[in-house]
């Protein structure tokens, strides 16, 4: 299993763009970038399929456009710098209760305490003033990379996880 890691003080702007263009991705736990062709799960190697989109060339389906419009009409959407606080930890804890694949108990365990290595933003979805979903992503000069999305399971039928990906 070939894998490489890059440790820098920051992965921002054109540095992040360069690493993403070469097939590198963020490692959450240690604030570095990595690339690999396989991952090991329970002593079995599985191939990794890195997904990238040239955003300007993406054509949304009618169903995706409908989802975007429905979420925008029903909820308020905001973008801001990513910070781990009690509000966002609450949503993560609710999501973790149904997302059995998540091993870490808190976002602080996943991201660590230093959230300055990357220029990370968060999209927040609110029902009135209550946070119901969040999606974090790193920003370069010409690229973005999704990091993690989570939502209140009580809102599952509204496809907020899909909205955050689209």
Where are these regions (language model features)?
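Acyl-donor-binding surface of acyltransferase catalytic domains
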Residues: 2-76
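A conserved beta-strand-loop-helix scaffold within acyl/acetyltransferase catalytic domains
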Residues: 33-38, 54-157
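Conserved acetyl-CoA-binding loop-helix of GNAT-fold acetyltransferases
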Residues: 157-166
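Short alpha-helical interface elements
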Residues: 40-44, 116-117, 162
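Generic detection of long, well-ordered alpha-helical segments
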Residues: 5-10, 81-89, 162
